[in-house]
Amino acid sequence: MSKFNFKTLNAEQDDAWAAMLQHDITFLTGPAGSSKTFMATAFAIDQILRKRPNEDGFEWIVMTRPTVDAGERLGFLPGNFEAKVSPYLQPIVDTIDKLVEKNSKEMSIIKASMRIRPLAYMRGLTFDNSVAILDEAQNVTREQMKLWLSRIGKGTKMIVCGDDSQTDLRESCLIQTAQLLRGMKGFAHVRMSENAIVRHEIIKPMMDRLSKL
């Protein structure tokens, strides 16, 4: 029996969890600190740890996010692909460290299941039996969004996390994509509002004021 026992903190987290459980593709959108990435990561951990040996289930946590962010380009960063992308995925890694006991059997299972896949090099890949998380999706292009969503394979759930109010692109396709997919079988979109913010209590009033910038 796994020691991992995640509990949601509010009604919006309940909605997000139910959506991810019941649908193949889930968009989680909302302001900074509203637990989008936290919920996606907790769900991935839960699903991986539920799998029993010789049973069907999720085997991999696939993680990615756009690496053209705040002016930085992947090709000019040092190291191999994984080394280049890893810093961008630190929020997901931090959440895993918070939720799973260090040096535990569960942590070993999660670490073995983690796969970092640069968004720029997705072509030709298919993700089977995976919980696949695209973080900071407000910064993906239309072509990247289509490429990512079309990687879904058998037994896979895709979770797209993003805040359309914080984008490094002139035109974000995040909400437009969610609107186009609305009503499609297997798709869900949950918007996490300011009420779901789980970071410091100052974030909500601060972001309200900074929205005027």
Give the location of each predicted region.
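Conserved helicase motor core of SF1/SF2 NTP-dependent helicases
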Residues: 2-134, 138-213
